Amino acid sequence: MLAFWQKEVGLPYEELLPMGRGLQQHRHGLNGSVLKINHAREPLGAEPRCGYRELWIARAGVAEPKRLVDPDGNVVVLVPPGHEDVSAIGMQLAVRDEAAFHDFYGRALELEPAGPRAYRCGDSRLSFARDPSAVVAGRMTASGYRYITIQVFDVDAEHAGILARGGSEGSAPRTLGSVARISFVRDPDGNWIEISQRASLTGPLPSDVKP
Protein backbone atom coordinates (compact mmCIF):
# COMPACT_ATOMS: atom_id res chain seq x y z
CA MET A 1 0.00 0.00 0.00
CA LEU A 2 2.69 2.52 0.98
CA ALA A 3 4.73 1.65 -2.10
CA PHE A 4 1.73 2.39 -4.32
CA TRP A 5 1.10 5.85 -2.88
CA GLN A 6 4.76 6.80 -2.63
CA LYS A 7 6.05 5.37 -5.92
CA GLU A 8 3.12 5.13 -8.34
CA VAL A 9 1.26 8.22 -7.12
CA GLY A 10 4.43 10.02 -6.04
CA LEU A 11 3.40 11.38 -2.64
CA PRO A 12 6.17 12.31 -0.17
CA TYR A 13 6.11 10.48 3.17
CA GLU A 14 5.89 12.89 6.12
CA GLU A 15 5.52 11.05 9.41
CA LEU A 16 4.10 8.11 11.34
CA LEU A 17 1.62 8.83 14.13
CA PRO A 18 0.56 6.14 16.63
CA MET A 19 -3.23 6.39 17.06
CA GLY A 20 -3.77 3.85 19.83
CA ARG A 21 -5.94 0.72 19.75
CA GLY A 22 -3.61 -0.91 17.25
CA LEU A 23 -3.84 1.90 14.69
CA GLN A 24 -0.94 3.69 13.00
CA GLN A 25 -1.34 6.68 10.70
CA HIS A 26 1.10 7.10 7.81
CA ARG A 27 0.92 10.73 6.67
CA HIS A 28 1.83 11.82 3.14
CA GLY A 29 2.07 15.29 1.60
CA LEU A 30 -0.78 15.98 -0.80
CA ASN A 31 -0.48 19.34 -2.59
CA GLY A 32 -0.68 21.28 0.68
CA SER A 33 -3.04 18.77 2.30
CA VAL A 34 -2.33 15.39 3.91
CA LEU A 35 -3.25 11.87 2.82
CA LYS A 36 -3.68 9.72 5.94
CA ILE A 37 -3.21 5.99 5.49
CA ASN A 38 -4.42 4.35 8.69
CA HIS A 39 -3.04 0.86 9.26
CA ALA A 40 -4.88 -1.49 11.63
CA ARG A 41 -3.20 -4.33 13.49
CA GLU A 42 -6.39 -6.40 13.44
CA PRO A 43 -8.46 -7.19 10.31
CA LEU A 44 -11.11 -4.59 9.51
CA GLY A 45 -14.74 -5.62 9.32
CA ALA A 46 -16.55 -5.55 5.99
CA GLU A 47 -18.37 -2.31 5.19
CA PRO A 48 -19.96 -1.09 1.94
CA ARG A 49 -18.16 1.74 0.13
CA CYS A 50 -19.06 5.13 1.55
CA GLY A 51 -19.72 8.18 -0.61
CA TYR A 52 -16.07 9.14 -1.11
CA ARG A 53 -15.35 7.46 -4.45
CA GLU A 54 -12.41 9.09 -6.27
CA LEU A 55 -9.47 11.24 -5.18
CA TRP A 56 -8.21 13.61 -7.89
CA ILE A 57 -4.69 15.00 -7.57
CA ALA A 58 -3.44 17.88 -9.74
CA ARG A 59 0.01 17.01 -11.04
CA ALA A 60 2.30 19.17 -13.18
CA GLY A 61 3.50 17.33 -16.27
CA VAL A 62 0.38 15.17 -16.59
CA ALA A 63 -1.13 15.77 -20.03
CA GLU A 64 -4.43 13.95 -19.49
CA PRO A 65 -6.20 12.25 -16.57
CA LYS A 66 -4.48 9.06 -15.41
CA ARG A 67 -6.65 6.65 -13.43
CA LEU A 68 -4.98 4.41 -10.84
CA VAL A 69 -6.33 1.94 -8.29
CA ASP A 70 -4.58 1.15 -5.00
CA PRO A 71 -4.34 -2.36 -3.45
CA ASP A 72 -7.57 -1.79 -1.48
CA GLY A 73 -9.48 -0.77 -4.61
CA ASN A 74 -9.45 2.99 -3.98
CA VAL A 75 -9.49 5.08 -7.16
CA VAL A 76 -7.02 7.96 -7.54
CA VAL A 77 -6.86 10.10 -10.67
CA LEU A 78 -3.84 12.24 -11.56
CA VAL A 79 -5.04 15.26 -13.56
CA PRO A 80 -3.44 18.30 -15.23
CA PRO A 81 -3.66 21.35 -12.92
CA GLY A 82 -6.95 23.13 -13.58
CA HIS A 83 -8.67 20.06 -15.05
CA GLU A 84 -12.36 20.43 -14.11
CA ASP A 85 -11.27 23.25 -11.77
CA VAL A 86 -9.01 21.00 -9.65
CA SER A 87 -5.93 23.05 -8.76
CA ALA A 88 -4.71 20.91 -5.83
CA ILE A 89 -6.97 18.00 -4.91
CA GLY A 90 -10.56 17.01 -5.54
CA MET A 91 -12.87 14.41 -4.04
CA GLN A 92 -15.68 12.88 -6.07
CA LEU A 93 -18.70 11.78 -4.05
CA ALA A 94 -21.63 9.53 -4.87
CA VAL A 95 -24.79 10.79 -3.14
CA ARG A 96 -28.37 9.67 -2.69
CA ASP A 97 -30.02 13.11 -2.64
CA GLU A 98 -28.61 16.15 -4.46
CA ALA A 99 -30.77 18.65 -2.57
CA ALA A 100 -29.61 17.30 0.79
CA PHE A 101 -25.99 17.48 -0.39
CA HIS A 102 -26.38 21.14 -1.36
CA ASP A 103 -28.06 21.99 1.94
CA PHE A 104 -25.36 20.38 4.04
CA TYR A 105 -22.21 21.42 2.19
CA GLY A 106 -23.52 24.86 1.25
CA ARG A 107 -25.48 25.84 4.36
CA ALA A 108 -24.29 23.68 7.28
CA LEU A 109 -20.59 23.66 6.31
CA GLU A 110 -20.80 27.10 4.63
CA LEU A 111 -18.54 26.09 1.74
CA GLU A 112 -18.25 28.18 -1.41
CA PRO A 113 -20.09 26.86 -4.51
CA ALA A 114 -17.71 25.79 -7.29
CA GLY A 115 -20.17 24.71 -9.96
CA PRO A 116 -23.66 23.20 -10.16
CA ARG A 117 -22.57 20.08 -8.25
CA ALA A 118 -19.41 21.15 -6.47
CA TYR A 119 -18.08 23.12 -3.50
CA ARG A 120 -14.66 24.49 -2.66
CA CYS A 121 -12.93 24.06 0.68
CA GLY A 122 -9.68 26.00 0.63
CA ASP A 123 -7.69 24.62 -2.31
CA SER A 124 -9.77 21.44 -2.44
CA ARG A 125 -12.83 20.77 -4.59
CA LEU A 126 -15.68 18.49 -3.54
CA SER A 127 -17.97 17.40 -6.37
CA PHE A 128 -20.79 14.90 -6.50
CA ALA A 129 -23.16 12.94 -8.68
CA ARG A 130 -26.34 11.15 -7.72
CA ASP A 131 -25.81 7.39 -7.61
CA PRO A 132 -28.61 4.89 -6.92
CA SER A 133 -26.01 2.52 -5.45
CA ALA A 134 -25.00 5.02 -2.74
CA VAL A 135 -25.79 3.87 0.80
CA VAL A 136 -25.53 5.42 4.25
CA ALA A 137 -21.91 5.19 5.41
CA GLY A 138 -21.17 2.86 8.30
CA ARG A 139 -18.21 2.70 10.64
CA MET A 140 -15.25 4.96 10.00
CA THR A 141 -12.77 2.17 10.82
CA ALA A 142 -13.09 0.22 7.58
CA SER A 143 -11.09 -0.05 4.38
CA GLY A 144 -11.42 2.54 1.64
CA TYR A 145 -11.71 6.31 1.67
CA ARG A 146 -13.50 6.89 4.98
CA TYR A 147 -13.23 10.56 5.93
CA ILE A 148 -11.99 13.96 4.88
CA THR A 149 -10.45 16.59 7.15
CA ILE A 150 -11.19 20.31 7.32
CA GLN A 151 -8.65 22.45 9.18
CA VAL A 152 -10.08 25.25 11.35
CA PHE A 153 -8.83 27.70 13.99
CA ASP A 154 -11.51 26.91 16.63
CA VAL A 155 -12.89 23.39 16.46
CA ASP A 156 -15.37 23.90 19.31
CA ALA A 157 -16.99 26.92 17.66
CA GLU A 158 -17.05 25.33 14.20
CA HIS A 159 -18.44 22.03 15.49
CA ALA A 160 -21.21 23.80 17.41
CA GLY A 161 -22.02 25.98 14.39
CA ILE A 162 -22.34 23.00 12.04
CA LEU A 163 -24.71 21.26 14.45
CA ALA A 164 -26.75 24.45 14.89
CA ARG A 165 -27.14 24.67 11.10
CA GLY A 166 -28.49 21.13 10.91
CA GLY A 167 -25.38 18.95 10.67
CA SER A 168 -25.20 15.58 12.42
CA GLU A 169 -22.61 14.83 15.09
CA GLY A 170 -20.12 12.04 14.57
CA SER A 171 -18.18 12.65 17.78
CA ALA A 172 -17.74 15.62 20.11
CA PRO A 173 -14.53 17.69 20.21
CA ARG A 174 -11.59 16.09 22.02
CA THR A 175 -7.91 16.93 22.39
CA LEU A 176 -5.23 14.53 21.16
CA GLY A 177 -2.26 15.32 23.40
CA SER A 178 -0.52 18.47 22.23
CA VAL A 179 -1.03 17.68 18.52
CA ALA A 180 -4.63 18.56 17.66
CA ARG A 181 -8.17 19.05 18.89
CA ILE A 182 -10.66 17.27 16.63
CA SER A 183 -14.31 16.40 16.21
CA PHE A 184 -16.38 14.62 13.58
CA VAL A 185 -19.61 15.52 11.83
CA ARG A 186 -21.52 13.48 9.24
CA ASP A 187 -23.20 14.53 6.01
CA PRO A 188 -26.71 13.39 4.95
CA ASP A 189 -25.31 10.09 3.66
CA GLY A 190 -23.38 9.51 6.88
CA ASN A 191 -19.97 10.31 5.37
CA TRP A 192 -17.49 11.24 8.10
CA ILE A 193 -15.88 14.69 8.14
CA GLU A 194 -13.12 15.49 10.61
CA ILE A 195 -12.96 19.05 11.95
CA SER A 196 -9.37 19.60 13.05
CA GLN A 197 -7.59 22.33 15.00
CA ARG A 198 -3.92 21.40 14.63
CA ALA A 199 -1.54 23.01 17.11
CA SER A 200 1.23 23.42 14.53
CA LEU A 201 -1.12 25.70 12.59
CA THR A 202 -3.18 27.42 15.29
CA GLY A 203 -1.05 27.50 18.43
CA PRO A 204 -1.72 25.99 21.90
CA LEU A 205 -4.85 23.87 22.21
CA PRO A 206 -7.71 24.26 24.70
CA SER A 207 -8.20 21.56 27.31
CA ASP A 208 -11.04 19.05 27.43
CA VAL A 209 -11.56 20.04 31.06
CA LYS A 210 -14.24 22.70 31.51
CA PRO A 211 -14.19 25.05 34.53
What are these model-predicted stretches?
Residues 20-27:
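Glycine/small-residue-rich interface belts in oligomeric ring/scaffold proteins
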Residues 1-15, 27-115, 119-171, 175, ...:
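Glyoxalase I/VOC metalloenzyme domain signal
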